[in-house]
C-alpha cells in the first residue's frame, strides 16, 4: 500500500497526524502538486478527482479523501482506536467530525482558495477551471468558521477532548482546522 500525498496540504496533514497517532508507517509518495503532478499520468487514471491524499492499495484499488483513508486504516489497524470503541463514542466522534468539517474546515478551505493568488483557476480542489476567485467567499468562509468556533468554545469548557473522554480523529481534525484558521 502507498499513500500519495502533498505534505503542506491540509488534507495530507490530516492523514499524516492520524498515522502518527496510530503509530503506523506506510510507504509514502510525495506528489509535486504545485507543479501539477496530480493532473499527469499515472495519477490522473489512479485518481480522476486529482486531489491528494489518496491511498493506493496493493490490489490497485484507490481510496481518496482523507477521512475515508483514515477509516480504512482504522479498520485494518483497530488497536488504539481514533474513531471510538462503543457505538456511543463512534456517534459522538462522528457528530463532532461532521460539525468541524462542515462548519469550519470546508468554509476555511474555500476562504483560502479564494484569497491566495496561487489558487487562481483552482478554487475547487482537484480542478483547473475558469471559476474566478471571489472575495465574498473568503469573507463568508472566515465568518462561518468564526461563528462555529465561537459557538463551540463554551461547549468545550473544562473538557480535555472534543468528543468523549479520549483523543480521537475529531481532535485531530479540530486542531488542524483551528491551526488553519490562524
Predicted regions mapped to residue ranges:
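GST-like domain detector, emphasizing the conserved glutathione-binding G-site
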Residues: 1-135
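GST-like fold's C-terminal all-alpha helical module
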Residues: 102-182
Amino acid at each position: 500500500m502507498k499513500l500519495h500525498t502533498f505534505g503542506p496540504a491540509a488534507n495530507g496533514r490530516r492523514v499524516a497526524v492520524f498515522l502518527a497517532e496510530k503509530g503506523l508507517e506506510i510507504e509514502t509518495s510525495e506528489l509535486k502538486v504545485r507543479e501539477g503532478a496530480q493532473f499527469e499520468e499515472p495519477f490522473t487514471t489512479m485518481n480522476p478527482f486529482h486531489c491528494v491524499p489518496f491511498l493506493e492499495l496493493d490490489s490497485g484499488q484507490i481510496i481518496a479523501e482523507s477521512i475515508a483513508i483514515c477509516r480504512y486504516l482504522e479498520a485494518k489497524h483497530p488497536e488504539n482506536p481514533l474513531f471510538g470503541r462503543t457505538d456511543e463514542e463512534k456517534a459522538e466522534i462522528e457528530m463532532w467530525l461532521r460539525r468541524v468539517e462542515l462548519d469550519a474546515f470546508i468554509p476555511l478551505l474555500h476562504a483560502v482558495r479564494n484569497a491566495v493568488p496561487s489558487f487562481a483557476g483552482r478554487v475547487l480542489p482537484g480542478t483547473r477551471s475558469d471559476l474566478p476567485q471571489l472575495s465574498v467567499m473568503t469573507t463568508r468562509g472566515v465568518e462561518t468558521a468564526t461563528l462555529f468556533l465561537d459557538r463551540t468554545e463554551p461547549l468545550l469548557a473544562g473538557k480535555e477532548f472534543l468528543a468523549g473522554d479520549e483523543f480521537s480523529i475529531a481532535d485531530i481534525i479540530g486542531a488542524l482546522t483551528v491551526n488553519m484558521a490562524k
